[in-house]
Amino acid sequence: MIYRLLIILLYIISYIADMAGQMMPQIAETAPQTVEQTTESVSSDYSRGFTHYAIAGNVLPYEWEWYLYCQLVDRGVEWFYPYAICQIWQESRWNASSTNGKDHGLCQQKGIYWDGRAANAGIPGADIWDPYAQLYVYSWMMSGYLAAAGGNVGRALSMYYLGVDAWSDEYVGHVMAWMDYLEVR
């Protein structure tokens, strides 16, 4: 009886892992192999649409903000940039060493998913505590979620927070509320 339960449990875990892999956004064929290579895409050509922000008087780290913007431009979702600023503020207050239970780093990635997400995003072996790796994986995930949600920001935010088939009015409300506190620097 226990043997059967173990087999069923292993099957369920395998199924969930397969489904999680299918639900993640697909990566571009030309994904960089290291985070350092992603900085090569950061170009001064992007500066025309870039805005340096603060939230409620807290100035954000310029280098991280610029890097995030360039990653979103590379993925064709630069319009999402102000929302991304607010979402990361909601997640960690832009603190790269933030920890909340099983969530770590700037974008509060779950440790159990990090290795797979980083590899799928094109940066296998990336350190979960590296803010540039966090921003790279975050922008990869959000561009996929935005595509899957047909550009619906609330749906994409919920997908990031709870998973593909979930919705959270509370989380979306918190992120959207920070939009009122964005200040141009």
Predicted regions and their residues:
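Structural recognition of the beta-strand scaffold that forms the well-ordered cores
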Residues: 86, 106-108, 156-158
